[in-house]
Every structure is written in structure tokens, then in C-alpha cells.
Amino acid sequence: MSQPFRSADIRQAFIDFFISKQHTPVASSSLIPHNDPTLLFTNAGMNQFKETFLGMEPRDYTRAVTSQKCVRAGGKHNDLDNVGYTARHHTFFEMLGNFSFGDYFKQAGIGYIWEFLTSDEWLAIDKNRLYVTIYETDDEAFDIWHKDIGIPSERIIRIGDNKGAPYASDNFWTMGDTGPCGPCTEVFYDHGADIEGGLPGTPEEDGDRYIEIWNCVFMQFNRQKDGSMLPLPAPSVDTGMGLERISAIMQGVHGNYEIDLFVHLMDAAAEILEIENQQQSSLKVIADHIRAVSFLIADGVTPSNEGRGYVLRRIIRRAVRHGNKLGADSEFFYKMVAPLVAEMGTAYPELKDKQSVIENAIQKEETQFAKTLAQGLRLLASELEGLKDGDTLSGEAAFKLYDTYGFPVDLTADITRERGIVIDEAEFDEHMQAQRERARDAGKFDVDYSSVIQVENPTTFIGYEQLEEEGVTIDALYQDGNPADSLTEGMEGVIVLDRTPFYAEGGGQVGELGEIRTASGVFEVQDTKKSGQAIIHYGVVTMGDISTKQTADAQVLSSIRAASAKNHSATHLLHAALREVLGDAVTQKGSLVSSEVLRFDFSYDKPVSTAEITRIERLVNEQIQANTPARIENMSIDEAMKQGAMALFGEKYGSDVRVLTMGTGSIIDGQRKPFSIELCGGLHVKRTGDIGVLKITSESGIAAGIRRIEAVTGMNAIKNIQQSEQQLSELASQLKVKRPEVAQRVRTMADKQRELEKQLERLEQKIASAQAANLLDDVQTIAGTPVLISTLSGIDGKSIRTLMDDIKSKLPDSVIVLIGDKDEQLALAASVAKSVTAKVKAGDIIRHLASELGGKGGGKPDYAQGGAPKAANTNAVVNALPAWIADQLG
């Protein structure tokens, strides 16, 4: 390989090498794993081939080569905290990989590794700097490395079970407690004796001298529940090599952040931030994080407060904080997108295509965080005052930074670590308990056996052109996820047929309903899903009994099929209309298509206006009224992309795809383009006119940068329009105006109500001021300090602050506690003179009150507020407060 060894050149060389070895190049999969709830993000090259290795998803090739986008931040695999402090940790990295699905095995797998690394035609790495590890009992791999490749035996290291259990080793890979597994061999590069560190398997192995660059897994066993290992009929190979690590070797540097790609990004960051010292760790953080952030947004993740979106938010905010540390006083991070596109946009065109979307999302998040960053940093500085190296920051302070100022706890930890201070994580977790409980509740799913049912034979779907099929065979039955020979009346279970007209849930469309009848019984199908290549029918036996291998008749409920098809086709027209009205930056984030309603989620950073909704709805209905054919064609994925077909979010496609084309669109380059052209395996109408009419029923935000439109079609749309008309007529009657005048009358009434509310607020403030004048008579002296505790009826949280300011001016060196009582809600406020805060703090008073009353609150030492529902014990709690304050004052 010719100099210079740029990262991009090495990536391409790897792919070219394996293409020359008859491997099929496969594009990187999305960072959002497809149908794998065990993963937060794609973190290895083999993720997209998992079902292929399990034998559930056949491919039309047996050898593959990829350069896979990977993220390790959040969840089990999390490198975020170490980025910027080590030479090789990243949130985003590229994994070069070659794969064999029952094709070549150890001999060729090891041979390819050695040839690519050491031959003069490719990387030409010094052979004497390479060491390998193998699993302790893998004599076959040892012989290949030693006898065939020629590596001295002293440079081949056997690694045994070093993780406390049989086959638990750094050199034995498993997919889970059961399933495919096997030994692996790893290649290490020796950076030289001037760097500390020992060989793999030694106590000094964590040093930086010997660095793993390539891992090759030989999947040759199938682990059983009892722990025994059975040989796989078709052994496979899964390898991975980090592009950043091999680039460091080829460029003669030791750390990943010294390679060309990072140097260019760090130079760009230094220029944007106008700093000269480019050796700062914060620049490494910014250079690393812009990669993870940009690729995540390009793959459809948006900043939010949960799941993947929250991890993205944490990464952005960590980068912004490091920019702030380097002197940034305005939004800067979004400006890093352009340098990244210049570096990686050719290899990953999605960066170019989504550049403006990425920049806008980052800038919006920066702007939002800037509102609280300075305040949060001041609070943290105050909390850290007096703490020294080795001390602990309270979990309560860390939680307040998270809850009030949007500081993820790892961002706070990042800052405290720079001063040698740790966070009381146990206390932080206590404060987070309520949020964690809510998150767990939100993450629960109904029982779904599709992931545990393993069916050998694929099901043939025949439902595109028919609703029923006679003479199908029941291949398998399941109850509670376990195989069964029969199901009797009243039993719920799952049926697998050899062929079926039932459409399985996919592409946003719900599974179909209907009946499966045999000579001995009737099974009511209540849902249909996929399990690998099989289609499984959920339901209940409503009559008689059903047995395996019986012949049956399968019939889909026709009315449900027709209504679902209308909604599914309408969803495609809606998607196209959204992009025409709101712009091409709109991308689908999810959908639900049932017989009753359609729901479409899409990326857009602001509410869709009423005028835009009207235009979108009109565009769709114009296409429906045109009554053009809905044309379905099967073609290669490459041909579909050439024709401009769009792919649905979250779907994975094979080499041949089904393309749905509908409507007539604009003329481009002299040719009339279709209104909508998308890849879709779902069920659709024959002509757009079959949809009847579409009516948008709601538009809302469901997460940061994600909007949702719900709509109905056909008779459901007619019913919706009629209901709206009836409601409008009733309103007009109540308001005693004509229907066209309803909106203006409502606006007039709203204006009048706002004016009345302002008058009421002014009146309440006057009442509060009048009450304040009388409160001074209630002041008591506790431990030499004036203390005023008073409950005020008709006062809410807004008025209580004004009242407090009035009283403070009359009682300067005192403790004041006010409880406003209005509409069965208590507004709590406490003020403590600065001269007294060393003994009692306002925040402590409010937290005590809130805790006793079942509310919440807090604040600063000199002023705090809270709230609580009025309870039976309110008077008792308030009456006991003087004694509690006396204890604090000593």
C-alpha cells in the first residue's frame, strides 16, 4: 500500500482486499439496531448479521466485508466517561470486519488476517511486532499460526478461562447463555519497549505497549442449556478491527487522537474556538463527540430525556461544557459538522445528505443548554467550595444539577474528577428513584413470544392477492411460548402454518385478524407476527381442538384488511405531502397502521401550523381524488434507489425489494415524477381513490424534534367530519352566533377572561399587602431570632413571593415562613436572613415542611419555595414548626 496511510485509504484498502477474496461489500447498518432490544446502539460489526449467524435470516452471499459505524455510550457498553482521558477510548468508532457464513473457517480466516497486515501489497506491518492470542485448547489455531504462518511459538499466547467459569475467557466468545459460540484469536501490535505494559495474560497487560488490533471469532459450537457444546453444522467466522487503532499504527503514532482524522477535527475545533494550545484534552472530547453526535442524528436519533435521545443529549452537553472550559461563550459545536463532513462524508454520504439537519439539531440543543449552563456551573462551584482532592460531593447537589440545570450526572462527574472529587452516587440514586421507576414502567412491553419461538421451516406468505387459503398445514403449535401437540377450547396459543394469507406486523402495519378452521376446531386469530422466516398467528381456540399436522383453512377478516390497506396507502401519501410542504429534512421516525386509524411520526423541530396542516391534507386528498393506480413492482434494491424510492425508518431490506408507486408529482428534468415512491412490503389499495378521503385529526409533539400526525380515512373520516360539524353547530347555538362567527366570538371571550384574571391578580396582591401589615403582630422570638410563621388563605405561589418581599423589608434579620392556602393547595415559602443561615437554611425548612405534608420543594439557604396538597395534618405540621426551628437554632 502506498504512502500516505490516511484513515480513508486504510478503510478502502480493507474493503478492496476482501473484495479480491470474493467477499460481498455490505454497507454499514444504522446505529439504531434493527429488532434487537438487547442493544442501545450498534456496537460491533456482527450486529447486523446476528440473525444470519443464528440461521434465521439467510443471505444471498456467504462472505461479507463491512466498515461498521459503532457507538459505545450508555448502557452496558459505555466509554463516555473515559473519552478525553485515555489514548484509545471513543464514543464513536469504525469497526472493519470480514465474515464467513458457513464458508471458510480457521485456515483461510487466519491467512487473510496475516496477508492483509504483513504483505507488501497491503499494510506491510513488521511481522516481528505482531503477537497473537488463542484460546487455551485451540490447538488447530496454534498450528495454523505456528506451522503455516510461521509465527514463533513464544509469540503465540494461550489464554484460558480467566473469568471464573468454563468457557468464560477473553478468548472464547459467546452470543448468550445458549447458542452459537467459539474460540477467538486476537492479533496484538507491540508499540515498543519505551512504552509501559506487558503481554496479554500477564499482570501488566493493561499497559499501552501491546495493543489489540484484530479479533477473529470462530463460531464452531452451539452451547446447550446444560452447558454442553455441540459442533455447528456450518462453522462461521466473525472478525473486527478498529480503524482508529490500525490507523495509528500505519501513521507511526501511539494514540488514536494523533491520527489524521482526529488531528483535522481538533485543528478545526481550535480554529473555531480561537485557541492556540492544541494539546488539551477538551479538544479530544470535542473531536470525538462530534462524530458520535452527527452519526446518531443522521441515523434518526434526536436529543430527548429518555433512551437513545438522552444519551445523545449527554454527549452534546459534555462537548459543550468542554468548549465552555476552553473559552466558548456562544454556540460553537454545530460548526464542527462541516469539518466532519469534509473528512467522512465521502465514505458515509448520509452525513452530506443530513448536514443541515445535524447542524440545526446540535445548535438547538446548544442554545437550550446555554440557558442553564452558566447557572449550573456557578452552583457546582459553590458546592465544591471548601472540598479538596479525595472529598465527596453530595448526591443531593448532583441531583439538583440534573433536575434543575439539565446536567447529566456523568457531566457533573466529569467536572468533579478534574479536581479529584467523587460524587455520592448512592445518595444521587435515592433522589433519582422516582424517575427510575417511571422509566421502568415506560419500558414494559406486553408478552411477545415472537422472539423466543424458534421455527425451522419458513412460512410462505400468499396474502398479497388473496384473503383465504384452503388446505394449509399446521406446522407447529405453541402455548406460553412452549411447543404443544394440541390446543383445546378456551386455550390461548400460537399457530404456525406452512403458508398463510395473514399479513404479519411490519412496516408499521398491525398484524391481521381472522380464523383458522380444521375438521376438529376453530382458532380465532387475534394478531399475526414474524419470528425469523416464520409467520406466527396469536389467538384462542373458540371451538373444539386444534392439533399439529392437521390440514386447515385460513381466512383473513376482509373488512379489517380493506380498512388497513386504505390507511397504509394513505400513510405513504401523507409522508410525501409532509416532505413537499415542510421540506426534505422531514424523515419518518415511526408509524402505526390499523383498520381504525393511521399514525405517522416524523422529524421536525417545531409544531406544524394550521395552514400547513390544511395544505398537507389538501395535497393528499387531491391525490385520492385523482384515482390513479397504486403500482407495485419487485426489483433490486439498487434499481429502487435509482428510481428515487424512499426506505421506511427502522426496516431492513434484502437485495430484492417491493416498491409502491402512487400519484403524480412534479415535472423534474422533463419527466413527470410520481407523488410517492417507497419501499414497502405491506398491503395497499388498487387505486388511490379507494382510500375515499383523509382527515387529519391531530398533530402533536411526542419528543424533542419529533412530531406526530394522526388521521383517519374512508368512512371513519366521514364520521369525524360529521362529528366536527355537529360540535360546531352546537357551539354556535350556545354562543348565539352563526357558525362562521364562532371563532371570533371565542377570541373575544378569551380576551375578556384574560383581563378579568389580571384584575383578580391585582386584587389578590392588594389583599396580600393588607394581610402583611397585620402579620408583624405574630412575630415570636426563638433563640434570640425573630421568627414569623403564618398561614394565609386565598394566597397562591405567585402572590406569596410578593408578600414575602414586603415582609422581609420590615423584618430584616429574621426567619419567615409563609403558607398560602388556595384551592386545596398549599404554597410554601421560607426566607432566612444571611446572618442566620449558618444555623438554619430556608431550603431545609421547605424540605422539612414538604416532606411532612406530602409535597416537594427546595431552594437556596436564604430563600426557598415548595408546594403540597392540603391535608388533614396541615395545622398540626404548621403548629409543630416553631419547635423544629428552635432545634435548628440551638
UniProtKB/Swiss-Prot annotation:
PROSITE patterns: AA_TRNA_LIGASE_II_ALA. One of its GO terms (biological process) is negative regulation of DNA-templated transcription. Zn(2+) binds at H568, H572, C680, H684. Keywords: Aminoacyl-tRNA synthetase, ATP-binding, Cytoplasm, Ligase, Metal-binding, Nucleotide-binding, Protein biosynthesis, RNA-binding, tRNA-binding, Zinc. GO terms for cellular component: cytosol. It catalyses: tRNA(Ala) + L-alanine + ATP = L-alanyl-tRNA(Ala) + AMP + diphosphate. It holds the Pfam family tRNA_SAD. Its main location: cytoplasm. InterPro entries: aa-tRNA-synth_II/BPL/LPL, Ala-tRNA-lgiase_IIc, Ala-tRNA-ligase_IIc_anticod-bd, Ala-tRNA-synth_IIc_core, Ala-tRNA-synth_IIc_N, Ala-tRNA_ligase, Ala_tRNA_ligase_euk/bac, DHHA1_dom. Gene3D superfamilies: 2.40.30.130, 3.10.310.40, 3.30.54.20, 6.10.250.550, Bira Bifunctional Protein, Domain 2, Threonyl-trna Synthetase, Chain A, domain 2. SMART domains: tRNA_SAD. Binds 1 zinc ion per subunit. One of its GO terms (molecular function) is zinc ion binding. Catalyzes the attachment of alanine to tRNA(Ala) in a two-step reaction: alanine is first activated by ATP to form Ala-AMP and then transferred to the acceptor end of tRNA(Ala). Also edits incorrectly charged Ser-tRNA(Ala) and Gly-tRNA(Ala) via its editing domain. NCBIfam families: alaS. This is Alanine--tRNA ligase. It comes from Psychrobacter cryohalolentis (strain ATCC BAA-1226 / DSM 17306 / VKM B-2378 / K5). The lineage of its organism: Bacteria, Pseudomonadati, Pseudomonadota, Gammaproteobacteria, Moraxellales.
